[in-house]
């Protein structure tokens, strides 16, 4: 029997090859109900190789071959379908990760900063100005620009919308006011002489400390200094811009640590020596309010610490009360000192020695060793021309009138001359105004109460 089977098998090989091809085609056509066979995938995996051998030995049994081919054919099919489906999301993840890798670390760690940079083109378009503190605002690869945006973002506690609004307003204000040009201006020595100074001290490592001094006790006449609010603001802004220049933000090479120390900040000293806290002059109040509004909007996060020196000890309760209503980030910057000679103790020894003697250091007084804005003497009394302005207008039509009436012109010209002579006489009649100068402190009082300027 075995011999007969071998003979029949050997003789049947050439005859069965065509049917095997037809069988394969039939299996491929009949393999459409593969799902039914997939339930048995584990069993045919071992029979797969044997099926190829048994096709020649058992030609009379095509269903077994068909079953094995059906099981073998669909088995790789789902693997082929599953194979591309798995790497697809991996590729998508790589595509998503690539832009994140390309971002600088300060943007990757701070999504709010990245969003603010996305809004920067709109801010520049709406404001029509692209300069802030001497820094031309560019893209996120420009370090000085990054530091400017970080300051506005920190001032608004990470709120992108609020930071965008404040940055827009600050740029609009700079466009209208042109503070960089105010630095080059000249101001009345009579009104502002001795009231504001700027110092830059270096420590042992060469690190600079920028200090602005506001000597409110030096005001001689409240009406003269604060009467013209816009003029006072221009002088105050010019002094601030000088200090901003010394911060050298436009030369920055490293990005500010959003959660760490900001090296681009200054110290402010407000001296209240001989200043009264009891009365508030209306002109002082108006100038103070305008100053706070401007500085709160246009100079955020430029203040490291603020020292109130020569403050009466009785005013200590005011600072204690203020801390209840202000954030810790703001109140930690306020330092009231009753004796100005103790101010230098708050700084390292190398810096301490550079302070004026009156503030506990070894250097000359501020008017000798510190800088200030350009001042000029008033050759003509400023308020005097304002009074005769109206009579001169009346005189003009009379001068243009026919010369038939020369008599009335003479007395009017004399009246004008008398007004010009009397005007300066009225100023010396106000020696008592020197006392109200003490009330100038009201300016700093409000500044201490208002956290806006301290930001």
Swiss-Prot record:
Residues 41-59 have a biased composition (Polar residues). Its cofactor is heme b. Residues 1-106, 376-455 are annotated as: Disordered. Heme binds at residues 216, 236, 270, 272, 306. It is a peripheral membrane protein. Pfam families: CRAL_TRIO, CRAL_TRIO_N. It comes from Aspergillus oryzae (strain ATCC 42149 / RIB 40) (Yellow koji mold). PANTHER family: PHOSPHATIDYLINOSITOL TRANSFER PROTEIN SFH5. Signal peptide: none annotated. Its main location: cytoplasm. It is found in: Cytoplasm; Endoplasmic reticulum membrane; Microsome membrane. The keyword Endoplasmic reticulum applies. Belongs to the SFH5 family. Non-classical phosphatidylinositol (PtdIns) transfer protein (PITP), which exhibits PtdIns-binding/transfer activity in the absence of detectable PtdCho-binding/transfer activity. Regulates PtdIns(4,5)P2 homeostasis at the plasma membrane. Heme-binding protein that may play a role in organic oxidant-induced stress responses. The keyword Heme applies. One of its GO terms (biological process) is Golgi to plasma membrane protein transport. It comes from the Eukaryota. Residues 179-367 form the CRAL-TRIO domain. This is Phosphatidylinositol transfer protein sfh5. Keywords: Cytoplasm, Endoplasmic reticulum, Heme, Iron, Lipid transport, Membrane, Metal-binding, Microsome, Transport. Residues 93-106, 393-403, 410-429 have a biased composition (Basic and acidic residues). InterPro entries: CRAL-TRIO_dom, CRAL-TRIO_dom_sf, CRAL/TRIO_N_dom, CRAL/TRIO_N_dom_sf, Sfh5. Residues 14-40, 63-82 have a biased composition (Low complexity). It catalyses: a 1,2-diacyl-sn-glycero-3-phospho-(1D-myo-inositol)(in) = a 1,2-diacyl-sn-glycero-3-phospho-(1D-myo-inositol)(out).
């Amino acid at each position: 029997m075995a011999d007969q089977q071998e003979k029949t098998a050997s003789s049947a090989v050439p005859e069965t090859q065509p049917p095997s091809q037809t069988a394969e085609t039939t299996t491929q056509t009949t393999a459409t109900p593969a799902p039914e066979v997939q339930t048995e995938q584990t069993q045919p995996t071992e029979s797969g190789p044997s099926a190829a051998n048994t096709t020649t030995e058992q030609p009379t049994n095509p269903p077994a071959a068909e079953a094995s081919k059906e099981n073998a054919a669909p088995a790789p099919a789902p693997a082929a379908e599953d194979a591309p489906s798995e790497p697809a999301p991996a590729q998508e993840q790589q595509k998503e990760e690539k832009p994140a890798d390309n971002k600088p670390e300060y943007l990757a760690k701070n999504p709010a900063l990245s969003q603010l940079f996305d809004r920067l083109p709109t801010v520049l378009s709406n404001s029509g100005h692209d300069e802030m503190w001497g820094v031309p605002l560019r893209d996120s690869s420009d370090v000085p620009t990054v530091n400017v945006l970080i300051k506005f973002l920190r001032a608004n506690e990470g709120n992108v919308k609020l930071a965008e609004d404040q940055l827009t307003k600050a740029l609009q204000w700079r466009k209208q006011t042109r503070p960089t040009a105010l630095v080059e201006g000249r101001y009345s020595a009579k009104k502002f002489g001795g009231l504001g100074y700027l110092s830059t001290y270096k420590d042992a490592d060469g690190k600079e400390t920028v200090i602005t001094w506001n000597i409110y006790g030096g005001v001689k006449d409240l009406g003269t200094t604060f009467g013209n609010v816009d003029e006072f603001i221009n002088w105050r802004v010019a002094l601030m811009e000088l200090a901003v220049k010394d911060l050298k933000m436009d030369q920055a090479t490293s990005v500010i640590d959003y959660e760490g120390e900001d090296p681009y900040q200054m110290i402010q000293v407000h001296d209240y020596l001989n200043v009264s806290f009891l009365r508030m002059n209306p002109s002082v109040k108006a100038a103070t309010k305008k100053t706070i509004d401007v500085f709160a909007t246009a100079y955020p996060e430029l203040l490291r610490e603020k020292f109130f020196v020569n403050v009466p000890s009785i005013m200590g309760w005011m600072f204690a009360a203020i801390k209840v209503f202000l954030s810790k980030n703001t109140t930690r910057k306020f330092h009231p000192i009753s004796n100005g000679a103790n101010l230098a103790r708050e700084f390292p020894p190398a810096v301490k020695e550079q302070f004026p003697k009156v503030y506990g250091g070894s250097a000359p007084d501020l008017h000798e060793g510190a800088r200030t804005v350009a001042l000029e003497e008033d050759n003509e009394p400023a308020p005097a021309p304002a009074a005769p302005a109206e009579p001169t207008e009346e005189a003009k039509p009379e001068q243009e009138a026919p010369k038939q009436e020369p008599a009335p012109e003479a007395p009017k010209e004399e009246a004008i001359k008398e007004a010009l002579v009397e005007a300066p006489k009225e100023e010396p009649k106000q020696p008592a105004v020197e006392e109200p100068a003490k009330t100038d402190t009201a300016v700093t009082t409000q500044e201490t109460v208002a956290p806006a300027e301290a930001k």
